[in-house]
From Swiss-Prot:
Cofactor annotation remark: Binds 1 zinc ion per subunit.
Entry cofactors: Zn(2+)
Subunit field text: Part of the 30S ribosomal subunit.
GO cellular component, one term: cytosolic small ribosomal subunit
GO terms, biological process: cytoplasmic translation
Gene Ontology MF term list: rRNA binding; structural constituent of ribosome; zinc ion binding
Listed name of the protein: Small ribosomal subunit protein uS14
Positions bound to Zn(2+): C17, C20, C35, C38
Keywords, in A-Z order: Metal-binding, Ribonucleoprotein, Ribosomal protein, RNA-binding, rRNA-binding, Zinc
């Protein structure tokens, strides 16, 4: 049984970027829910460190 967009919204399983609203390329680990572009912009201010 395939799930349509309408069904996913009803069950609350769709996620979007908290900052810009984009639905693709989400970083959901640790319930961050930011798209990868927004994550790259604000990761340092969230306490993440970049190694090499």
């Amino acid at each position: 049984m395939s799930e349509t967009d309408g069904e996913a919204e009803e069950t609350g399983q769709t996620h979007e970027c908290r900052r810009c609203g984009r639905e693709q390329g989400l970083v959901g680990k640790y319930d961050i829910w930011l798209c990868r572009q927004c994550f790259r912009e604000i990761a340092r201010s969230m306490g993440f460190k970049k190694y090499s």
